[in-house]
């Protein structure tokens, strides 16, 4: 592996191979994702998630922070707030929510946990 490959991962979103999303339980084929730095064992890192029109996430709780940026489309959160392209949202550790989209959307997700102490 080249030095660049060890230090940087570039995702060409148009050519990325998205996989069915399964981080919140059962496979959700209407939601796909592409890991960038996500580590399943540590439950943190970044990824891009695509939700097809009509897709709904399962209700879930976060052990750490979940931040995301709407890249395309609109996403409605469980409290009814509509998030649009350019909106950035941050959920605190222990928070729970679910979301859905009528239009379809693409989001960049960043899950992280603060250092203990």
Question: What is each residue range found by the language model?
Answer:
Residues 1-42:
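A short, N-terminal "cap"/entry segment at the start of jelly-roll beta-barrel domains
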Residues 30-62, 92-96:
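Conserved short histidine dyad/triad with adjacent acidic residue
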Residues 44-48, 68, 105:
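Structural motif
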Residues 53, 62-78:
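Glycine- and acidic-residue-biased ligand/ion/polar-headgroup-sensing regions
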Residues 61-63, 81-83, 101-103:
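Short glycine/proline-enriched turns and hinge-like loops at secondary-structure junctions
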Residues 77-97:
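Short acidic-glycine-tyrosine-enriched beta hairpin
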Residues 93-117:
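Ligand-binding loop in jelly-roll beta-barrel domains
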């Amino acid at each position: 592996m080249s030095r660049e490959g060890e230090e940087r991962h570039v995702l060409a979103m148009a050519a990325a191979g998205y996989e069915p999303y399964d981080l919140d339980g059962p496979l959700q084929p209407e939601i796909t994702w592409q890991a960038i730095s996500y580590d399943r064992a540590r439950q943190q890192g970044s990824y891009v998630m695509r939700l097809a029109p009509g897709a709904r996430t399962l209700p879930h709780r976060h052990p750490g922070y979940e931040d995301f940026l709407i890249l395309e489309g609109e996403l409605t959160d469980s409290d009814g707030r509509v998030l649009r392209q350019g909106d950035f949202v941050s959920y605190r550790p222990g928070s729970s929510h679910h979301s859905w989209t009528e239009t379809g959307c693409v989001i960049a997700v960043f899950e992280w946990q603060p250092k203990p102490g």
